[in-house]
Amino acid sequence: MKYELNGQVVLISGGSQGLGRAFAQKYIEESDSTVVIVSRSEEKLTRAGEAICGGARRLGAGGAGRLLYYACNLGDAAAVGGLFATLADAGLQVTQVLFCAGGAVPGLFAELSSAQLAAGVEMNYGTALHLAHGAVRHGARHLVFFSSAAAVYPFIGYSQYAPLKAALRALVAVLRQECDGVRVSCVYPGNFASEGYAEENRTKPAITAAIEGSSEAISCAACCDKIVRGLRSGYDDVTTDFVGWLLLACNMGFNYHSTTYFLWPLGWLLGALVNLLVVPIYMLLCRWDIHKWRTQREETHLAAKTD
């Protein structure tokens, strides 16, 4: 199924900011599609509408305009049911769904609160789960999930985030087998500069930042453009940088593979070689870095107690 910007009714979760808002803006500026942005906060949605095109109208309120918004807790299945009922009342048949909602609160597992961990499950998996369930039942033809490079390389500091992004990858694999006639794509973006990314860096442990490295965060608009190019090229596992592509090549697994992708043979070969030759050495280095960090941390705590 070809990816098209034009002629769609597009539902974007997390559409009030970050990458979701960038996609909404792209559809409004470069197509004739109707766009529905969804998030919890009506205030953020109205601000996003003003920034994108001078103002959006609330779904179900009547009036003209291609950009609509709907405030909804997507982690609540009943609320998602209400969203699709409102879409039906407005005469809108959603054709594409972009699952942009999500976010990370980096921190050590034992130091995160139960509320933070539960919020991670809802925000990064529950919202996509319920929205996808409704979308499949209501005839959407293209689902675009947003996972993360952390789904294929989870590491220290991302216990609230990475396991749920990995769960999304598993859900995508199942839906590709179950949903005949529905295109199911999954994006594994690297770092991009957004409100959520700035918030992440406030709580990110030093060891997490060290292992993650100093990769530059690209703009949301640039990230959006890369994803659109990948989808238009027919790729259903889309990355936005070389590191993400390499990580995915190392984690092909029992999953649908886009064998028409011209770099697929290289990815298969390179992934096998990296797994055999590079990963064992790299993981030893990571263990050493974590050991040093843990030792320094214990010494700091001991010195603080002594003082």
UniProtKB/Swiss-Prot annotation:
Gene3D superfamilies reported for this sequence: NAD(P)-binding Rossmann-like Domain
GO CC annotations, alphabetized: endoplasmic reticulum membrane; lipid droplet
Membrane topology, from the record: Single-pass membrane protein
Enzyme class, broadest EC rank: oxidoreductase
Active-site residues per Swiss-Prot or TrEMBL entry: S147 (proton donor), Y161 (proton acceptor), K165 (lowers pka of active site tyr)
Regions that span the bilayer: 261-281
GO molecular function term, any single one: NADPH binding
Pathway: Lipid metabolism; sphingolipid metabolism
Ligand binding (NADPH): G14, S16, G18, R40, K44, L74
UniProt motif (GXSXG) ranges: 14-18
Domain of life of the native organism: Eukaryota
Cellular compartment(s): Endoplasmic reticulum membrane
Main location: endoplasmic reticulum
Sorted UniProt keywords: Endoplasmic reticulum, Lipid metabolism, Membrane, NADP, Nucleotide-binding, Oxidoreductase, Sphingolipid metabolism, Transmembrane, Transmembrane helix
Catalytic activity, EC: 1.1.1.102
One Pfam family linked to the record: adh_short
SMART domains, alphabetized: PKS_KR
GO BP term (any one): sphingolipid biosynthetic process
UniProt record similarity statement: Belongs to the short-chain dehydrogenases/reductases (SDR) family.
Annotated PANTHER family: 3-KETODIHYDROSPHINGOSINE REDUCTASE
Name of this chain's protein: 3-ketodihydrosphingosine reductase TSC10
